[in-house]
């Protein structure tokens, strides 16, 4: 099935979903190593079998990743390589998803109750707004299809809603700074202890200066994951979640807390 889709001149949203599932064998949300090489090999074979040339985007992709063992792409990158239907592709090209800071601000707009999740109806409104900003409108049936596909693509724990880290897979890999924090997340007890330590005035939130101190310490302790030279970027992206410069416990937990235990 993936072969016939890779031979198409236009790939629908549902076909794109099937292609992604075919190659993302471990369900990580990214293609890397053998998965990525399988995609490149099957793409070249499928196009050749159908007597089709690789598109310029495909050629660039193959040249960039074909000889690399350390390549890694997300859904966004694949959507730009394959001839995906225009309105679905626009969801990956919108301004709100070109930088992590803009993405965080958009997340804050839709996670209005600070629950740490965006549920189905909120996701539908989010996608509708993205398309409207690109001067595109789709009917309710198509919007529902896109919403359902986004949940299937990103909802890794199948709870019917998206966490920040799941939603962040809409970002290009190089823009997704949350990946840097995946390996250093704390359990709930450790996180609460850290929050109280850096909330130096005990007012229930962390301001920019307190966050700066926390990030510096995290960078010192986790040099393999975090680069102290990128503190300004980390801080700017995290503060985009704040409420008027006040970063509350639930907001910071989205970045640094792995769970309740």
UniProtKB/Swiss-Prot annotation:
PTM annotation (N-acetylalanine): residues: 2
Cellular component GO terms, alphabetical: axon; calyx of Held; cuticular plate; cytosol; dendrite; extracellular exosome; GABA-ergic synapse; glutamatergic synapse
InterPro entries in the record: Calbindin_Ca-bind, Calbindin_six-EFh_dom, EF-hand-dom_pair, EF_Hand_1_Ca_BS, EF_hand_dom
Binding site for Ca(2+) 1: 24, 26, 28, 30, 35
Positions of the UniProt region annotated as Interaction with RANBP9: 2-7
BP GO annotations: cochlea development; locomotory behavior; long-term memory; metanephric collecting duct development; metanephric connecting tubule development; metanephric distal convoluted tubule development; metanephric part of ureteric bud development; regulation of synaptic plasticity
Binding residues for Ca(2+) 3: 155, 157, 159, 161, 166
Cross-referenced PROSITE patterns: EF_HAND_1, EF_HAND_2
SMART domains tied to this protein: EFh (SM00054)
List of residues binding Ca(2+) 4: 199, 201, 203, 205, 210
Keyword Chloroplast listed: no
Alphabetical keyword list: Acetylation, Calcium, Metal-binding, Repeat, Vitamin D
Residues annotated as binding Ca(2+) 2: 111, 113, 115, 122
Transmembrane region(s): none
Segments forming domain EF-hand: 11-46, 53-88, 98-133, 142-177, 186-221
GO molecular-function term, one example from the UniProt record: zinc ion binding
Domain-level remarks: This protein has four functional calcium-binding sites; potential sites II and VI have lost affinity for calcium.
Assembly and binders: Interacts with RANBP9.
Task performed by this protein: Buffers cytosolic calcium. May stimulate a membrane Ca(2+)-ATPase and a 3',5'-cyclic nucleotide phosphodiesterase.
Family note: Belongs to the calbindin family.
Record's protein name: Calbindin
Organism: Homo sapiens
Gene, per the UniProt record: CALB1
């Amino acid at each position: 099935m993936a072969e016939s889709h890779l031979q198409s001149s236009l790939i629908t949203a549902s076909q794109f979903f099937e292609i992604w599932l075919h190659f993302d064998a471990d369900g990580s949300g990214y293609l890397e190593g053998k998965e990525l090489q399988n995609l490149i090999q099957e793409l070249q074979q499928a196009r050749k079998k159908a007597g089709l040339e690789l598109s310029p985007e495909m050629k660039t992709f193959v040249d960039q990743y074909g000889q690399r063992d350390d390549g890694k792409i997300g859904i966004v990158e694949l959507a730009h390589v394959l001839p995906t239907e225009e309105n679905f592709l626009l969801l990956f090209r919108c301004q709100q998803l070109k930088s992590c800071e803009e993405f965080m601000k958009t997340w804050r707009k839709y996670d209005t109750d600070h629950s740490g999740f965006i549920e189905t109806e909120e996701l539908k409104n989010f996608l509708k707004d993205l398309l409207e900003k690109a001067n595109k409108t789709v009917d309710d049936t198509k919007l529902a299809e896109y919403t359902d596909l986004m949940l299937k693509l990103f909802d890794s724990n199948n709870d019917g809603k998206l966490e920040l880290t799941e939603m962040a897979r809409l970002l290009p890999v190089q823009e997704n700074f949350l990946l840097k924090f995946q390996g250093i997340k704390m359990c709930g007890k450790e996180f609460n202890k850290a929050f109280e330590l850096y909330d130096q005035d005990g007012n229930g939130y962390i301001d920019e200066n307190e966050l700066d101190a926390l990030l510096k310490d995290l960078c010192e302790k986790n040099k393999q994951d975090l680069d102290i030279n990128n503190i300004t970027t980390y801080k700017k992206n995290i503060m985009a979640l704040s409420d008027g410069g006040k970063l509350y416990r639930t907001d910071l937990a989205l970045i640094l807390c792995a769970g309740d235990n």
